Each structure stands twice: as structure tokens, then as C-alpha cells.
């Protein structure tokens, strides 16, 4: 049986000028293609939840986004509100500056947000574009120590998004102790398949429909 690629997609819309009708389309497409989740900014959680309430599509919300430069208390509060308004998953940005200082507070912060999430999945964005290869490995281990469910490549707001090398490094460091989400600049079916084969078990993209249409032409199975 072929993999159902649609079931590893987080269809994403987190740009600053997002309008309600764009969220309508995001959610309608997610239901049509049966994507695993949609990912939105905090201001659209309750709006998107109302649209998705009779579907199987999960709702993901970003926290500390896109810079990660909010405090632990702020990230915890933001996650609490998002969950209260209907978020099923949280994608949180790691404090990259504190990580580079090797501060143990980064692990404490991840654990604090995971405690709020409970059984809901927590994905931690490490912004690989700003890290060396060794720092990427260390960041994966920090996320493992923080009890995160996923380590995620990128916000999509830095100078580049996910690369194949990033995911390969993350996959080797993860050692099956944490899952990997690739995101940022994923626009083609080839990128999608390459990143999946490199070890990403969830892929975030703002080009989900186009990718599914390309996959169909390539005769990959999907719903």
C-alpha cells in the first residue's frame, strides 16, 4: 500500500496580512484533500476551529512566532489561550539566542509549554538557517530533553527554509526519539518527497494543494 502523502501535511497560512476568506479556503482545501492539519496564527484559531469542527482536520497554532523572542511565561500563556480556543497542536519557536548561549532555560521553556499541551503534540521550531550543523544536532537533543514531540526546521521567515541536509542531520540526531517536521520554502512535489525520504514525518507548506496536484500527476496515491 502506498503512503497517503496528504496525511503528513500541515497546510500552513501564517503570513501577516492573512484575511478571513483565505482561512476559509485553507480549511476547505484541507477538508477536501484530507490534510492532517492546518497551521495558523493565534488570532485565527477560534475562527478556523469553527470551520473545521465537523471535519477530521487538526488545528495547529504557532507560539512565540516567528522570532522565538518572547519569555517562557508569554509562550506558556499563548499556548494556553490557543488550546482553550481549539488548537490541537502547538508549533513553538525555540529561543535561538538563549540556545546559542547554551542556557538550560531553553529546555525548561520547552518542558513548560509541553506541560500545557499535555497529550497534544508540541513541535519546536529551531530555525536551522541560523544554526551550524553541530548546533542543529544539539538543538534536536534539547528538544528531546524538553519532551517535545517534534523538532521542526523553520518558520519560513528567515533567509531560507528547510534543506535536505538539515533534515538528514536532524534525522540522524533524533535516533527515533523525536519526530521531524520540515517546513519553509517547500513548494514542489520533488522537495516534498525528498524531505519525507530524508526523515520528515510531517511537512508544513503553504503550497499544499499544488503539491498534491503534482503528486497526482506523478501517480502517487492520495485521497
Curated annotation (Swiss-Prot):
GO terms for biological process: 2-deoxyribose 1-phosphate catabolic process; carbohydrate catabolic process; deoxyribonucleotide catabolic process. Keywords: Cytoplasm, Lyase, Schiff base. Pfam families: DeoC. GO terms for molecular function: deoxyribose-phosphate aldolase activity. It is found in: Cytoplasm. It comes from the Bacteria. It catalyses: 2-deoxy-D-ribose 5-phosphate = D-glyceraldehyde 3-phosphate + acetaldehyde. GO terms for cellular component: cytoplasm. Its EC number is 4.1.2.4. Pathway: Carbohydrate degradation; 2-deoxy-D-ribose 1-phosphate degradation; D-glyceraldehyde 3-phosphate and acetaldehyde from 2-deoxy-alpha-D-ribose 1-phosphate: step 2/2. InterPro entries: Aldolase_TIM, DeoC, DeoC/FbaB/LacD_aldolase, DeoC_typeI. Coiled coil: none annotated. The active site is at 91 (proton donor/acceptor), 152 (schiff-base intermediate with acetaldehyde), 181 (proton donor/acceptor). It is an enzyme of class 4 (lyase). Belongs to the DeoC/FbaB aldolase family. DeoC type 1 subfamily. HAMAP family: DeoC_type1 (MF_00114). Catalyzes a reversible aldol reaction between acetaldehyde and D-glyceraldehyde 3-phosphate to generate 2-deoxy-D-ribose 5-phosphate. This is Deoxyribose-phosphate aldolase. The gene is deoC.
